[in-house]
Design a protein with these regions (language model features):
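Pyridoxal 5′-phosphate
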Residues: 1-173
């Protein structure tokens, strides 16, 4: 599966953690693969979507712009590491820290960033980070890092699975 498909699969699995009236935040500089899965989840679960703007000078999401959107109902922040539109590189560590302090999960699309620098997901403090190896000379598929405790707690929606053990739980066939 590609990054978009994996994000969609995880959005389906994560949806049951959220209740009507909960909020998710999506950055306005996202690739569609990190927007539609969350919008469908929000529609299905009656969630409120809050949009996080980016700075028109830096072409990045500034941590200060995230603070007013966070509250006790915030359950997820979806943002990219680097924009496919502007080339802006977000301070994911700072943004993730703010979101996690509010009790929200953090899902990062690193497709445009992964080929340029090493990524330490634990240092960033993200819950999920998705990328596509074809951007750095690998096969055309998606890869998602997920915190083990979260992945173990999720039900995988699929037709048939090779195994319930990680990482195969989210694979078909």
């Amino acid at each position: 599966a590609n990054m978009t498909t994996l994000t969609y699969q995880l959005s389906r699995s994560l949806a049951h953690r959220f209740a009507p009236g909960d909020e998710i935040i999506i950055s306005r500089m996202e690739h569609e693969g990190n927007v539609s899965p969350w919008l469908q989840m929000a529609q299905d679960r009656d969630l409120t979507v809050r949009w996080l703007d980016f700075d028109r000078d830096s072409w990045c999401v500034e941590p200060e712009s995230l603070k007013p959107l966070l509250n006790e109902r915030t359950k997820l922040l979806a943002l990219n590491y680097a924009s496919n539109m502007t080339g802006g590189v977000n301070d994911v560590k700072a943004l993730a820290s703010l979101a996690r302090e509010a009790g929200a999960l953090v899902y990062v699309d690193a497709v445009q960033f992964a080929s340029h620098r090493l990524i330490d997901v634990k240092d960033l403090g993200v819950d999920f980070l998705a990328c596509s190896p074809y951007k750095y000379f690998g096969p055309h598929l998606g890869v998602v890092y997920g915190r083990r405790d979260l992945l173990e707690s999720l039900h995988a929606y699929k037709l048939r699975c090779a195994s319930e053990d990680l990482p195969y739980r989210f694979s078909v066939g």
